[in-house]
Amino acid sequence: MSYETISIEKQGAVDWLTLNRPESLNAITTKMVTELRDYFGSLYENESVRIVVMRGAGRAFCAGLDIKEGSARKNEGDYVPFGGGMGFQGYLAEVYIRMRRCPQPIVSLIHGPACGGGFSFVLASDIRIAGESARMNAAFIKIGLSACDMGSSYFLPRLVGTSIASELMLTGKFIHAPRALACGLVSEVVPGVELVNAAKPYIADMLRTSPMGLRLTKEGLSMAIDAGGLEAAMAIENRNQLMCSRTNDAKEGMRAFLEKREPVYTGS
């Protein structure tokens, strides 16, 4: 499908996904959700894309839900997605599930506000780099809702610990770039104009890995976080490592190491 609220720029094996409603600080609309569901859903079967970089156009990463659209929908009886019986709530929630399910690592470049559902885009990513202007919050609680929404209660405690997650979610206060770096929420903080350049070393390092090795590392991490214990986590590791070890790329990686050269992976 063609997209109106997001844009995809393909650079080799890397997709640069831009939330593209700058006039509304990239606020989330039903159309944006439809497009994000389509895009992230398609990645599961897309072998040519190895990495996704997610960012926002204009002054913000994503200001969260477009409240104006939501109010209009309620007042005018506009179409509401089924969302598994949960309406728009379930419809949007599926985006974050697809972000975690897709085998491609997602790198988020955050500048300006990332609020509510926009904050959850950040949390559902695999690597986060913040511009100096970045500020993030679980904004739901500020508008009479629970802060536990769109995966935030799952992701945030795992990233920063229960204590900081409780503080941020119970108050709705912003966490700014310096503190986000200090508590491990982001990998680094750079001037906003340097965000793209800051992402390039991460991208280059990941592109030097084998395609299957990269995919199964994301999958293994996601599964191990929820594993019942060490043995369950190691069972996942053993399964994935056995699969990787039987590929031609694994043989090439070992040959290249012994021959002191860069490996040439073919994805086989």
Model-predicted regions and their roles:
Residues 221-227:
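Short, charged, surface-exposed hinge/linker loops at domain edges
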Residues 32-35, 91, 195, 237:
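Hydrophobic alpha-helical membrane-association signature
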Residues 97-214, 242, 246-247, 251-255, ...:
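Crotonase-fold acyl-CoA enzyme core
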Residues 17, 21, 36, 54, ...:
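Terminal peptide-recognition signature
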Residues 56-98, 144-145, 228:
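Glycine- (often His-adjacent) and acidic-residue-rich active-site loop
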Residues 1-57, 73, 97:
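Conserved CoA-thioester-binding segment of acyl-CoA-metabolizing enzymes
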